[in-house]
Amino acid sequence: MTTLTPILTRNWDQADSFTRAAYEREGGYRALRRALGMPPDDIIQAVKDSGLRGRGGAGFPTGMKWGFIPQGDGKPHYLVVNADESEPGTCKDIPLMMANPHVLIEGIVISSFAIRANHAFIYVRGEVLHVIRRLQQAVAEAYEAGYLGRDILGSGFDLELVVHTGAGAYICGEETALLDSLEGYRGQPRLKPPFPAVAGLYGGPTVINNVESIASVPSIIDNGADWFAAMGTEKSQGYGIFSLSGHVTRPGQYEAPLGITLRELLDMAGGIRAGHRLKFWTPGGSSTPIFTDEHLDVPLDFESVGAAGSMLGTRALQIFDETTCVVRAVLRWSEFYAHESCGKCTPCREGTYWYKQMLKRLEAGKGEEKDLETLLDLSDNILGRSFCALGDGATSPVVSSIKLFRDEYLRHFEQGGCPFDPAASTLWGGATK
């Protein structure tokens, strides 16, 4: 039985967990003092040795990404933290920044020192004003204590940190669209190469990492790369925050080693809501192919989830019981992607629009089996042809739902409407059963 590993979340139950005093009480900023006494390249090597992979979805090795930054080039280097958490079901970074913003700030200072960056940015969703205020308060506290600014802790290292508010576009979670937005332009993905490590923010070498990725760095420096690498699986090392939402008794954030299964997490969360059973779930948010109860024992690591036909993504585990219409769920996700498409490329702009139109008609029972083949053909014209991964992600729930629940689509056509009571899947609907 895998057990939880509260590291990033260990002080969330403290009333003042978001303050500098509470963070220092738990050993906060100890790793920073150690890091400032190390050669920057040794920090990068430690992160490589730990096996830390990006926690924002792609799972790219963090230390390797840092190593791409050219040194001795005479250009200013930048660190950008992607806190534009916007995908349906993904809800780990916002509570982390609310409950423990100083672990992120400490990670930013260490990471910036490692890549020789003197300017860092936290790009936050514009809608989460409470998080923005919490971050700004924490940054001010860090400046007051000498953890930010000039000559940090007498090391001679300078770092300016800016909390930047986005305008609410999901596309700005794509790293190059985020850079465009940060520079004051409309957020749209850039052509790669050149990659941000060579020509990123303002044309300078830039590292872009997820909140949880950067927040994991202090524990690696404090406890050692071997400590981190000992957790998780052989190729997916360390711990992560798993977000359980939907039809589960105790939804929330569960921090555990990678490789834990949904069955184990559901046991910790009290199981599916009383009187119901699991129907389908997402392992990594709405942009990942859905799983069913047959996948309860798939280890939640990058390789195992990929081998089973989906992606670990952001570990946003959306749980749906048998009262949920899979067609309606896929329609809701498709409406989101159609609304959030930036419009730059034709496959995504037109494809997500037609997803929405077709699924709305099919959910109402106005379709036939050949329409499913049209949806799959449409998916083939989006997947791999869109300018960025947003288009690819939009195809995942559509294709996987047709593969796993074709009969449910056909029931809509046979009955001339949705066979599910929409109220039954709600919290109050479930309570009346």
Where do the model's predicted regions map?
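Short acidic, glycine/serine/threonine-rich loops at helix termini
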Residues: 58-59, 64-66, 90-93, 132-137, ...
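Short amphipathic, charge-patterned alpha-helical segments
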Residues: 107-111, 257-275
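Gly-rich Lys/Arg/Thr-decorated short loops/hinges at beta-loop-alpha junctions or inter-strand turns
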Residues: 23-29, 81-93, 196-201, 243-248
